[in-house]
Curated annotation (Swiss-Prot):
Its EC number is 5.4.99.25. Belongs to the pseudouridine synthase TruB family. Type 1 subfamily. The keyword Iron-sulfur does not apply. InterPro entries: PsdUridine_synth_cat_dom_sf, PsdUridine_synth_N, PUA-like_sf, PUA_sf, tRNA_psdUridine_synth_TruB, tRNA_sdUridine_synth_fam1_C, TruB_C. Keywords: Isomerase, tRNA processing. The lineage of its organism: Bacteria, Pseudomonadati, Pseudomonadota, Gammaproteobacteria, Pseudomonadales. It comes from Pseudomonas fluorescens (strain ATCC BAA-477 / NRRL B-23932 / Pf-5). It is an enzyme of class 5 (isomerase). This is tRNA pseudouridine synthase B. It catalyses: uridine(55) in tRNA = pseudouridine(55) in tRNA. Responsible for synthesis of pseudouridine from uracil-55 in the psi GC loop of transfer RNAs. The active site is at D48 (nucleophile). HAMAP family: TruB_bact (MF_01080). SUPFAM superfamilies: Pseudouridine synthase, PUA domain-like.
Amino acid sequence: MAQVKRIRRNVSGIILLDKPLGFTSNAALQKVRWLLNAEKAGHTGSLDPLATGVLPLCFGEATKFSQYLLDSDKGYETLAQLGKTTTTADAEGEVLQTREVTVGRADIEAVLPEFRGEIKQIPPMYSALKRDGQPLYKLARAGEVVEREPRSVTIARLELLAFEGDTARLAVDCSKGTYIRTLVEDIGEKLGCGAYVAELRRTQAGPFSLAQTVTLEELEAVHAEGGNEAVDRFLMPSDSGLLDWPLLQFSEHSAFYWLNGQPVRAPDAPKFGMVRVQDHNGRFIGIGEVSEDGRIAPRRLIRSE
């Protein structure tokens, strides 16, 4: 008997998941996609299986704006295990070296300023960055080590929250592309004892915080009671991650031409940058960029939601 193909639903919006421990970001995405029975889905930047916390999941029209969330600043809390280094710079790797921990709170506080502001990081071998089309982590698993260029990242906040014995809990606010594993490893080397990430929790992703998230268990419970459509109540509007952008409202006439790819003028437009756009009914219809001539050029459009 032929298997009936599941017809997926055309749903749009963002679900802020508190990613559970042990899940890859894609596995978490596919699980929530199944609960929604959503046609189109994508996430906004991977969290390691070891990590938990804020993972914005985009569905339908919201996937058009996922890159802007991917580029946003992030916040983390991490538990650094001092005295050991591992192959992966986290608890999943094999121990490479063990050293005595003779540092105290004051020693840690003294080195943290060196890692604030704009710093250079060498990406870890166990990362999704690619070399000749191959992810570095695959090369690392095969025992290969390749040269990686240092990258500039910005650490806006680096604070010692707690110190006990051989562990230090840190709060980090950082730019996109920052590797917390590398940061912790570098701090450990500066202290002379080595360190790796024992725990990692993302507390912020762009404008989104942990307080706004929903757990997988909560989604599953709602789905068990009411099916796919019951999960829709957790969907946030597609432009939720862009609320700090200037908002313009077009007339019916301007919206028509803009949705057909034509740049238009708006009296309240800023002099430059990206903007969110609503039609005359207050419906979000996409994002645009202010051109040199002052017109708003369409960049990503939503025709209906």
